Curated annotation (Swiss-Prot):
Amino acids binding Zn(2+): 194, 228, 230
InterPro entries per record: Enterotoxin (IPR008992), Staph/Strept_toxin_CS (IPR006126), Staph_tox_OB (IPR006173), SuperAg_toxin_C (IPR016091), Superantigen_bac (IPR013307), Toxin_b-grasp_Staph/Strep (IPR006123), Toxin_bac (IPR006177)
Cellular component annotations (GO), alphabetically ordered: extracellular region
Protein name, as recorded: Exotoxin type C
SUPFAM superfamilies: Bacterial enterotoxins, Superantigen toxins, C-terminal domain
Length: 235
């Protein structure tokens, strides 16, 4: 009987300790919004690599090595890391366009990006996007023609960057004094589907590599299927 009572007491103490500690663990695991903004402001204050009609030197199961000599000089290249499924769509000597954000920079030989690759497109186009902005659930001015894309096939990385850049320039979403604490982009297609992009996601240590790794899938969209974008910001 004594043994049973001791076991009960130990069990009760354990439950109390767990319930006391759990909230602390939860709050510590969530990165403070000021740190998230700081990470994202640093990561996206960047000039993207925007190169046209470059040749693929070689490909592996997860990497494309792309010749950018005509832009950067002899023996200069871009190394694009991507998922296996994405990399299999390209092969050696393919001509591609690059729009990517570097996470490692080696000024002597090349840059390292995630995804950011589309087939080379020689036609000149101007797609002026239709967009809407909502702040704390209230509709603001429309953002029609604020974002322009100059290719028929683009990566979500390019759309994401250009919309973020507009928001950073005009709404200061990542500034320390910014009132915004969460937000997302929703990209609508003509078949009624929606793709979401979290505007306040800074995983792991919040390095450029951590933040840009989501572009490994090299997701693309044909602008013939693009409908509009919606931005939702919360204070």
């Amino acid at each position: 009987m004594k043994k049973i009572n001791i076991i009960k007491i130990v069990f009760i103490i354990t439950v109390i300790l767990i319930s006391t500690i759990s909230p602390i663990i939860k709050s510590d695991s969530k990165k403070d919004i000021s740190n998230v903004k700081s990470d994202l402001l640093y990561a996206y204050t960047i000039t993207p690599y925007d190169y046209k009609d470059c040749r693929v030197n070689f490909s592996t199961t997860h990497t494309l090595n792309i010749d950018t000599q005509k832009y950067r000089g002899k023996d200069y290249y871009i190394s694009s890391e991507m998922s296996y499924e994405a990399s299999q769509k390209f092969k050696r000597d393919d001509h591609v366009d690059v729009f990517g954000l570097f996470y490692i920079l080696n000024s002597h030989t090349g840059e390292y990006i995630y995804g950011g690759i589309t087939p080379a497109q020689n036609n000149k186009v101007n797609h002026k996007l239709l967009g809407n902005l909502f702040i704390s659930g209230e509709s603001q001015q429309n953002l029609n023609n604020k974002i322009i894309l100059e290719k028929d096939i683009v990566t979500f990385q390019e759309i994401d960057f250009k919309i973020r850049k507009y928001l950073m320039d005009n709404y200061k979403i990542y500034d320390a004094t910014s009132p915004y604490v969460s937000g997302r982009i929703e990209i609508g297609t003509k078949d009624g589907k929606h793709e979401q992009i979290d505007l306040f996601d800074s995983p792991n240590e919040g390095t450029r590599s951590d933040i840009f790794a989501k572009y490994k899938d090299n997701r693309i969209i044909n602008m013939k299927n693009f409908s509009h974008f919606d931005i939702y910001l919360e204070k």
